[in-house]
């Protein structure tokens, strides 16, 4: 799964790209690990590289 780091600027680009709607929007964006398919679309879209693979 991917995670959103503190670098997130809450722009919404990632949520728009997620094919399974695993990203919840808010002041802090979060990725639902149960829904995430590891496609990487969100990370590719992030303008500040705030989305990284979980260790």
Curated annotation (Swiss-Prot):
InterPro entries: 4Fe4S_Fe-S-bd, 4Fe4S_Fe_S_CS, 7Fe_ferredoxin, PSI_iron-sulfur_center. Binds 2 [4Fe-4S] clusters. Its cofactor is [4Fe-4S] cluster. Keywords: 4Fe-4S, Electron transport, Iron, Iron-sulfur, Metal-binding, Repeat, Transport. Gene3D superfamilies: 3.30.70.20. GO terms for molecular function: 4 iron, 4 sulfur cluster binding; electron transfer activity; metal ion binding. It holds the Pfam family Fer4. Ferredoxins are iron-sulfur proteins that transfer electrons in a wide variety of metabolic reactions. This is Ferredoxin.
